[in-house]
């Protein structure tokens, strides 16, 4: 089996679904796998996955998956350069905006720019504007 970096979201989903994580309810594994598969930029949860698990998923589950997928996308962006430059974040909710203040050791402009690519998905999921400093 070959694993391409650009499909890591699909490979992560497969690994989560097919790993025998004892003590984790099956539904939680499904939700985690869907979060992993849906976190790529402009990526939605694959419809075939939703259909495959429709019998155990509620609309609230799918909403939670969408929200968590956006958070995972932003978190992954905070290590875009793979140099661990972002060491922490603080978040404040002010009115219709969520303001994320990065703590960094060095220039994190690449990470911020990449994370801001999720602004529209964040707005759709949370109904708030995303600002990253």
Regions found by a protein language model. Give the residues of each.
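Divalent metal-dependent catalytic cores for phosphoryl transfer on phosphate-bearing substrates
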Residues: 1-91
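Residue-level detector of family-conserved "landmark" positions at structurally sensitive sites
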Residues: 26, 132-133
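Low-complexity, glycine/alanine/valine/leucine- and proline-rich hydrophobic stretches
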Residues: 78-132
């Amino acid at each position: 089996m070959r694993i391409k970096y650009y499909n890591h979201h699909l490979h992560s989903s497969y690994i989560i679904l097919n790993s025998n994580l004892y003590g984790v309810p099956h539904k939680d594994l499904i939700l985690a796998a869907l979060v992993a598969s849906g976190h790529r930029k402009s990526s939605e949860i694959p419809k075939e996955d939703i259909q495959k698990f429709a019998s155990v998923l509620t609309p609230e589950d799918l909403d939670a998956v969408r929200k968590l997928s956006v958070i995972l996308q932003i978190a992954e962006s905070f290590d875009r350069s793979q140099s661990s430059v972002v060491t922490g974040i603080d978040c404040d909710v002010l009115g219709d905006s969520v303001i994320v203040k990065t703590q960094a050791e060095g220039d994190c402009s690449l990470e911020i720019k990449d994370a801001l690519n999720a602004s529209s998905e964040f707005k759709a999921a949370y109904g708030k504007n995303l600002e990253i400093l």
